[in-house]
Amino acid sequence: MNAESDPLFVQVARFVEDLVVDGSLEPGQRAPSTNELAAFHEINPATARKGLGILVDDGILEKRRGLGMFVTPEARERAVQARRERYAGEYLAPAIDEAVRLGYDRATLHTLIDRVAESRGMYQ
């Protein structure tokens, strides 16, 4: 799963959210069940259920009684928007803090960011 510092139920939510964002789970498709997630991640089903509950609360999944959880039509847009809102605090701030500790100036930091972005295919 994701960041080990996050509670397990948050890691489950992010795991399923990843499937939505990358297109592995499409709108209308059934999401993995709590038991499937629990078995896959070797966790308690209640923990998996709590993670799925986050996605229901966020409008990414919807419950269909007797059928399971399904991806909502607007799931990907909601998930991407939520991640964009978290991005600066969760990823950029720690990277900038480390750059300051290492004594990078602005130009060097920009060069490093460009180099990494290019190596990951961002500018193609």
Model-inferred region functions:
Residues 16, 54-55, 70, 111:
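Intrinsically disordered, low-complexity segments enriched in polar/charged small residues
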Residues 76-78:
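A short, flexible beta-alpha/helix-coil linker loop
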Residues 30-63:
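N-terminal helix-turn-helix
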Residues 33, 67-73:
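Minor-groove-contacting beta-hairpin "wing" of winged helix-turn-helix DNA-binding domains
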Residues 1-36, 40, 80-82, 86-124:
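Extreme N-terminal segment that seeds HTH/winged-HTH DNA-binding domains in transcriptional regulators
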Residues 21, 26, 49, 64-66:
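Short glycine/serine/threonine-biased micro-segments
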